[in-house]
């Protein structure tokens, strides 16, 4: 029996209905703070994502108060680049564990895309960062700070939408005074110096994290490494983030400058918030004449595998009846106190269902920064700076030259 099959069958929440309404169908991923499930709102017949917090948070009044407050605040946010929050519940002593009901994004995470394809060319990086900045800008305008911007919290839909999730959870956990090594390991690479030094954070802390994320998208790695999460975190206290062009050839100077300002060790030197960062990014896109781009969802994502497991009838009792005796959950979830992980294709007991054909993609040849261009979708619109046909030819030639410099000048396997 595979570990995936064993886990799906052993999880006591599978097949139950949280608060008698939200059916728990399949595990998507598990981490230090929570387990994420594919589920169904049986009242509205709507697929949802269920983030069930670790059982150690149940009964913690301080955590539950903050958890409920943050959930209500995030649920009021509306805008592109944000994963919608529909409901929250649980957490009372003897009750179900605390949980969030969120929009189910059919696709995968930015982390999974990076693992599949490696570092991205500038136009793809811009396409990822633009909706992230828009989503964060909406939150910052409402007085909210994410505090945990990282590839695992960026979702990419099969339709090419990029959205950020998990607002407010870090603050709720921190104020509850409950920490774990796995939580620290999951965030250390993206923490701002002030978060490491004093624990303080504001919109500029999110800006710093986006700068680190931009560096990683361009180079395939984060700027600071170390043997422990603590050593990784403290490196940013005394060291500036190096320009990405020093790690991989072909990065435009405009991206070096953007990341340098976003990751200034002094918060006063950074962009004030995500809106200001987004405006600066738009100027870079315009100056470089970067084409619009449809971000591809990862092919082998945990979300896709969870959907396959559910639709194939893989349940804790091994039956083909997907929801026998669905009732309220009165059991605690499995203890997920370990590093966040998702299941690999080999762990799935049944073959993956084929994904829809990407007929809208326009095949091309070659690679750019380790990414097969044949998988990319180039929008059929010209850049505002393209005023005549000969400019298009110049841009194509420049892109081919950059592709050659990026591919030949780097040992891409070492960057993943």
Model-identified regions with their sequence ranges:
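Eukaryotic protein kinase
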Residues: 1-302, 310, 314
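C-terminal or otherwise distal, non-catalytic regulatory regions appended to signaling enzyme catalytic cores
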Residues: 1, 308-416
